[in-house]
Amino acid sequence: MKYRKLIILVLSILIILPVSTLDGHHIANADDDSPKKLKYKENSALALNYHRVRKANFLNNFIYFFSSSKEIKNYSVSQSQFESQIKWLKSHDAKFLTLKEFLYYKKKGKFPKRSVWINFDDMDETIYENAYPILKKYKIPATGFIITGHVGEENFHNLDMISKKELKEMYKTGLWEFETHTHDLHNLSKNNKSKLMKASEATIIKDLNKSEKYLTKNFKKSQKTIAYPYGLMNDDKLPVIKKAGLKYGFSLEEKAVTPNSNDYYIPRILISDDAFEHLIKRWDGFHEKD
């Protein structure tokens, strides 16, 4: 009877998963199954973006291997995979940067060799439970892009969001910085268009000002950056983003960052196990001689 219930539960989850959490994430070349390799430029850095870090238990592993959900395959790694990736980066002498350092080197025009900046979008409970302890263990800095109007919310697009108490605990370690993922514009319309890109100028400015106020009140400082929901932005909305006082914007694209990367389209590589194996491990920056 116990196993029968488990099988029914698993089958139910597999049916539900194709209509998954925060549907509509987009990344350039994400649907291309051809062999990949990042173009290498000597003066460059890697911005590694994560969304979910799931527990490596039987149920989650079963779902991962048998589900066709892109949310599961492309937007999550297991806790064991995440730790393995961090250990690989450390063993290959990655220079882990804070967001402040990352932006400083970009503006200065020269990145240290093997520069890596770790960041997370949405900030649901899986980050606190499964990624935070590993980063703390290895003393790796990271940045979390928060949907500030939904902190602590249960069942936000089927996700339990991290609480303010947990965010403050992470911040006090000195390893975490927090930036905006909007206050309440992280949604898709019926035609799969980002709510941020459909909103009026007044709505966007009001939303981003609310988010900035939340960040400065709770975490004292902000680098004035935004990770666009779903990694999507267009040129028509950039004047509004700038008018709201933001200095940098982050997209999702399989490219290394150079000093010449557009400040409002800074590419971050969405990390799955496949992306790490085929993009990050093969990046020439980890194989050049000093």
Curated annotation (Swiss-Prot):
Function: Catalyzes the N-deacetylation of poly-beta-1,6-N-acetyl-D-glucosamine (PNAG, also referred to as PIA), a biofilm adhesin polysaccharide. N-deacetylation is crucial for attachment of the polysaccharide to the bacterial cell surface; it leads to the introduction of positive charges in the otherwise neutral PIA polymer, allowing electrostatic interactions.
Enzyme Commission code(s) on record: 3.5.1.-
GO MF term (any one): hydrolase activity, acting on carbon-nitrogen (but not peptide) bonds, in linear amides
Family: Belongs to the polysaccharide deacetylase family.
UniProt keyword annotation of Signal present: yes
EC top class named in words: hydrolase
A biological process from GO: carbohydrate metabolic process
Secretion signal span: 1-28
Gene Ontology annotations for the cellular component aspect, listed alphabetically: extracellular region
Subcellular location field: Secreted, Cell wall
Pfam families given in the database record: Polysacc_deac_1
Keywords noted in UniProt: Cell wall, Hydrolase, Secreted, Signal
Protein name stated in the entry: Poly-beta-1,6-N-acetyl-D-glucosamine N-deacetylase
Organism: Staphylococcus aureus (strain N315)
Domain NodB homology: 114-290
